[in-house]
Every structure is written in structure tokens, then in C-alpha cells.
């Protein structure tokens, strides 16, 4: 714009190959590359969660994709503050993200569905179990109770894993 503020649409996607190339040149290891790529890919979604006022379930799922949710919040806060000053809502966004991170950590402290729990409700062990567990975790992080997440998963994936 005329004030010298630049925005790069989809920089979180376009930046990943550049980031990987740069870090590889300086000898970053595989774990460091994975961490930095993950942070780069996800950091703009934190802003979307704030500006669209998405629910806890959505921020829980975002944080669950992150290698380090705490660092993702710190990166988003730094990104919002940009050139050293605060954006109009950067303090509010920081508070929002910290509250959502606390909600995510609380959700993680609650029991999560296990393969044994799904099997006890009639699912058969097999190739579909990993996908079923992923779905049960997603439901739990979105606010479903433990029993409800298990029940919905068994209904969706079938007691016999029919769609393997």
C-alpha cells in the first residue's frame, strides 16, 4: 500500500521450499527442517482462527497439527506485530491464542479414545483402525465426550471395518 506495508498472499505455502533450501544449505537436520516447515505452513491459520473467531474445536485441530503449539502461538504473535509495532488487534489476538492454547492443553489432559475402546464397542482390528483412531481423536478435540466420540467413530467406520 502507499504506507509501504507489503503482504504476500500464500507466503506460508510459497515459503516452505525457500525455507527448506536455506536451512539445508546451512546444515539443518531433518528434525529442524520438519519443525520449521510445520511452523511456516501453519502460522497463517492462527490468524484466520482469530479473525474469523473460530471455535475451540478448530483451534484444537490446528494446534494438534503443530509440532510445537506453544511455539506456533509465539510465531503468530511475532508475525502479528510485524515491523516492531502492534497491529490494530495484535494484543487481542495474542490473548485469544493463549486462551485457545490453554483450552487445547486441557483437552489433551482428558482421556482420548484408544484402539481397545473401539474394539470393545465392536470394531475389528485392521487397516481401518488407524483412520478410525484419527477420527475419534478429531471428534474428541472438537468437544465430543469420550463415549460419544467412540460411538460416532464405530458408526462411521462400521463394526466390521467394511470399507477397508
Regions found by a protein language model. Give the residues of each.
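Charged substrate- and nucleic-acid-binding regions of tRNA-handling and nucleotidyl-transfer enzymes
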Residues: 21, 81-164
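Divalent metal-dependent catalytic cores for phosphoryl transfer on phosphate-bearing substrates
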Residues: 1-88
Amino acid at each position: 500500500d502507499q504506507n509501504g506495508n507489503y503482504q504476500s498472499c500464500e507466503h506460508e505455502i510459497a515459503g516452505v521450499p525457500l525455507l527448506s533450501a536455506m536451512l539445508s544449505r546451512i546444515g539443518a537436520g531433518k528434525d529442524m527442517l520438519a519443525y520449521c516447515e510445520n511452523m511456516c505452513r501453519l502460522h497463517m491459520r492462527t490468524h484466520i482462527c482469530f479473525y474469523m473467531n473460530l471455535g475451540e474445536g478448530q483451534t484444537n485441530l490446528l494446534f494438534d497439527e503443530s509440532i510445537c503449539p506453544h511455539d506456533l502461538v509465539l510465531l503468530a504473535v511475532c508475525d502479528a506485530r510485524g515491523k516492531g509495532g502492534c497491529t490494530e488487534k495484535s494484543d487481542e489476538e495474542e490473548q485469544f491464542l493463549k486462551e485457545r492454547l490453554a483450552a487445547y492443553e486441557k483437552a489433551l489432559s482428558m482421556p482420548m479414545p484408544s484402539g481397545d475402546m473401539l474394539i470393545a464397542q465392536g470394531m475389528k482390528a485392521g487397516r481401518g483402525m488407524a483412520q478410525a483412531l484419527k477420527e475419534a481423536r478429531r471428534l474428541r478435540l472438537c468437544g465430543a465426550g469420550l463415549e460419544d466420540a467412540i460411538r460416532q467413530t464405530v458408526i462411521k467406520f462400521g463394526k466390521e471395518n467394511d470399507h477397508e
